[in-house]
A protein has these predicted regions:
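Surface-exposed cleft-lining segments at the edges of enzyme active sites
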Residues: 24-34, 161-171, 188-194
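Amphipathic coiled-coil/heptad-repeat helices and related helical stalk/stem segments
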Residues: 35-39, 175-181, 202
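Active-site acidic carboxylates
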Residues: 2-144, 152, 206-218
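A short glycine-rich beta-strand->turn/loop micro-motif centered on a GG-aromatic cluster
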Residues: 192-196, 214-225
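Catalytic cysteine-centered active loop of the rhodanese-like fold, especially the PTP/DSP P-loop
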Residues: 58, 164, 185-212
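Short acidic/polar capping segments at secondary-structure boundaries
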Residues: 22, 115, 197-199, 222-224
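Alpha-helical scaffold elements lining the catalytic groove of polysaccharide deacetylases
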Residues: 117-187
Length: 225
């Protein structure tokens, strides 16, 4: 989606933001990807709700905590050396009223971890088969693809046969769908989606949304690889 296409939609549009955090920004290596500040600035200038997926310490999958991610966003919007000015009269530091702030009440932050579809994605299982498997998991009320049950081979639908083939091929790497709420995703139907990585965690979120016909608009210039 191009910038000019969302200008007319208003600032209150919902946003899904995936993995915009220090660990993936390059800042820890002294080489921050320029798209990260652009994403943060864009999200902060909007006024609608934000569903923010992160990989944080709750899942043990990155060196970031939710608090350090929020601090990274705050510092990006207004660096610490600009946030306060020294007051000679009080001999203390005053908060700069012109420094922009992030309204964290707009945000729902989900520490999702990662890798729930990645083995299948990286192995080259077709997206349509992954989506069909996700739908089957919810229909059977299962969270792990190894728990799926199907009728005998002569009674299966072609789609069920494709799922079974993928399950057998990926026997040691199941799909898991217990990492987020589908009802929560549905509340963000039509949302802008930003972040990344394009073919990794962001793509996992897109596949889950597609499985339940939840629409989204990817802003390509605000997606990192």
């Amino acid at each position: 989606m191009k910038a000019k296409e969302f200008i007319t939609e208003g600032l209150n549009h919902p946003i899904i933001c995936v993995d915009v955090q220090p660990e993936y920004s390059g800042m820890n290596d002294g080489d921050e990807n320029s798209v990260f500040p652009e994403i943060i600035d864009f999200v902060n200038k909007q006024t609608g709700p934000v569903l923010m997926f992160v990989n944080a310490e709750d899942q043990g999958l990155s060196g970031d905590s939710v608090q350090s991610i929020k601090q990274y966003w705050d510092d990006t919007i207004c660096p610490e050396d600009e946030r306060y000015t020294y007051n000679d009269e009080t001999e203390d530091y005053d908060e700069n009223p012109d420094c922009p702030k992030i309204n964290w009440q707009r945000f729902t932050i989900v520490d999702k971890g990662y890798g729930y579809f990645r083995a299948w994605m990286d192995h080259g299982i077709e997206p349509a088969t992954i989506i069909a498997t996700i739908r089957e998991l919810y229909q059977q009320k299962k969270s792990d693809s190894r728990e799926l049950q199907f009728p005998a081979s002569n009674q299966r639908t072609p789609q069920q046969s494709l799922i079974m083939g993928a399950m057998q091929e990926m026997e040691d790497d199941p799909i898991s769908v217990n990492w987020t709420s589908v009802s929560q995703l549905k509340r963000f139907n039509g949302a802008y989606i930003v972040g990344g990585a394009r073919d990794q965690c962001l793509r996992e979120v897109e596949l889950l949304m597609s499985a339940f016909n939840v629409k989204y608009k990817r802003i390509d210039r605000l997606v990192y690889t």
